[in-house]
Amino acid sequence: RRSKMEKGIDAYIKEQFHLPPVDIRTYSPLTLAYIGDGIYDLIIRSIIVGKGNTKASRLHQETSKLVRAQAQSEMIDLLLPYLSEEETDIYRRGRNAKSPTMAKNATMTDYRKATGFEALMGYLYLKDEFERMVELIKIALGEEEEGKEQTF
């Protein structure tokens, strides 16, 4: 028998693994970016796989186009006018965080903007604002109009 998951996936995982509640405002921007990187990657992989079964190398190639720092940097540029004050603040905190690493094949500017984008994704995920996260990703991918095919 399957049980229906009433909450967001993060709340469900915390409940199932008996994790204590945490105030996400206490998370560092890089922690938000860490979880944001994972959930954004999962969403993009789901979109790519949903477009049809193909070779793993092709799936990786298509996914990589959208998860690399340059693509995320371009996405956040498109999204800034759509962000609330709170979302913009989270993005800026992520962008301005001092990261000990840098992405391969990315400028420092793109890498920092991508970190801000990922921090925003992580923040929305941890707040169970999955619909808002998907809405922003659809805008960034050029699919904000109902039923419009993606252009990547």
Language-model segments: residues:
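Double-stranded RNA-binding/processing signature
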Residues: R1-F152
